[in-house]
């Protein structure tokens, strides 16, 4: 079976290797602004993931293979926290998350190029941050790590020191809930 990861994320590549030995990487250039947030996080991340999968499918000149696409958001106080637009924006996000609980949603879409069948699911995890002081936040931002991550932190990196506890799937917070992915692939009849 030919697998295609519709992402350039190093984190997703590392996680996918845990369940799929060989795969091709074809990043999506889907414009996420095409999907308006309607207040439902699970629908939103699945719709974004579907857009990425179909975007990659439209670039391919083949009729077999499985496309795997995912999108992750942080949700806090009624707002979606995406990737920060600047260091100051990252600071504001991290300061707002300090001492609070937020939710991390990841959508997963599996698209079979031969049958045109789509399966979608999502995962939600809750994350509690410790109280962060300004120095901690500024030092973290200097590492550059928060600049390409939803919510301005990476639990698998230096940002993990901010996390007091989680409820749910750790891999979801990293960016690819491999348990959900494994069972979605099984539902599609893919043997791993």
Curated annotation (Swiss-Prot):
Swiss-Prot/TrEMBL catalytic activity: dTTP + H2O = dTMP + diphosphate + H(+); UTP + H2O = UMP + diphosphate + H(+)
Molecular function in Gene Ontology: dTTP diphosphatase activity; UTP diphosphatase activity
Annotated catalytic residues: 71
Gene Ontology terms: cellular component: cytoplasm
Keywords assigned by UniProt, alphabetized: Cytoplasm, Hydrolase, Nucleotide metabolism
Example GO BP: nucleotide metabolic process
Cofactors (names): a divalent metal cation
EC number: 3.6.1.9
Site (Important for substrate specificity): 11, 72, 156
Subcellular location: Cytoplasm
One Pfam family this sequence matches: Maf
Top-level lineage group: Bacteria
Family assignment from sequence similarity: Belongs to the Maf family. YhdE subfamily.
Function: Nucleoside triphosphate pyrophosphatase that hydrolyzes dTTP and UTP. May have a dual role in cell division arrest and in preventing the incorporation of modified nucleotides into cellular nucleic acids.
Name under which the protein is recorded: dTTP/UTP pyrophosphatase
